[in-house]
């Protein structure tokens, strides 16, 4: 098993020193993730590309998933690599691998070459293509729009026969840009905006303003953990939770109805700015889009921005909602967002779309800012990798089992893609598949006289979901950890 990783082209327009630094960071990121998830997989930096190889196909799917979801990679080539003696040896190797593919088909050979050789790329294409045409009678050469394109690369003394192309994520390697703090709510917008900055090379930390209790926080942690685990697990990332209910209560009591929405957003930004300052983070990220709600008009956004000296980034500012949802679907956060509880304790009957500075300041003069400072001081921060540990500590009554008791049902709560890649089958045991994001709505329809053992690959999601179900009054759930 061998993959050739092509870095994003923007990296190569940088200066030599920056290019080397970026590719070195990319190599390190790939190595960290692969070492955490697989065994005996080697990573090598070859200046203009990175090679990832192993002696077996045991971790093929895991490695391919890692490479196609790691920022900074333009494409991933799956190759068969070998040495060669001369042109004829190359032809014979290509014939052995491609004979069956081109039978009764039209084909063309496309070659790239780098290094010192006694032949050109065009001569290589002609020699190999002509040989294949003579050796496979049912095949014929067609230079434009053929059925099969045989792609080969000769690099110094190595022949790479390209078996498949896989599109990479693009962007810059994680850690090449400065850290950001994302104001995450778990909905469509904040998940996509966080992803876009991860893709661009920033370590994105997460700040959650809790307005809806533990169930909402569990859901948001799932989204943040998913984004980190899938796209940025080479980095150490913080998750900060701020209990904002006291702030909301103060706004409801002290602020005039029409100004509540903008004042709440200003409080969010003040608090996020304090958190960012504590961790020396220069910019905040939000999922706001222009005109989406009353607090997101240009006038109101300007009044919101002035309360902090941190740069506020809004990557979705001109996006339509359907565009945002499409990206959420592509990156895997749509199902989280669809089932995320929407909490907002500040709902104005007639929210202002064009706030006035003097009126906002007059309303905020009634607000007790000691409350805001207190909730920020009491904010809970954790390493995002410790979400599994926290869920276990928060719910010690959630039992974990290795053996399956009689009549128990195993609930495979992995996503459909994960379940398809590695179906869970246990002899003599009933296994049901309900994705984690449907548990909240479908678990109550199950036979509650039975015990259900929740299963996921790493035990993180199963613990969080077990905690959530127990909070909803279901005591017939355990975590299955074979």
From Swiss-Prot:
Disulphide linkage map: 344-456
Pfam name, any one: ThiI
Biological process, per Gene Ontology: thiamine biosynthetic process; thiamine diphosphate biosynthetic process; thiazole biosynthetic process; tRNA 4-thiouridine biosynthesis
GO annotations of cellular component type: cytosol
Family annotation (SMART domains): THUMP (SM00981)
Domain THUMP, residue spans: 61-165
Sample GO molecular function, one term: tRNA-uracil-4 sulfurtransferase activity
Residues binding ATP, per UniProt: 183-184, 265, 287, 296
Domain spans labelled Rhodanese: 404-482
CDD domains (UniProt xref): PPase_ThiI, RHOD, THUMP_ThiI
Pathway: Cofactor biosynthesis; thiamine diphosphate biosynthesis
Keywords of the record: ATP-binding, Cytoplasm, Disulfide bond, Nucleotide-binding, Redox-active center, RNA-binding, Thiamine biosynthesis, Transferase, tRNA-binding
Subcellular location: Cytoplasm
Top-level division of the source organism's lineage: Bacteria
The UniProt record lists the keyword Disulfide bond: yes
Similarity field: Belongs to the ThiI family.
Name used for this protein in its record: tRNA sulfurtransferase
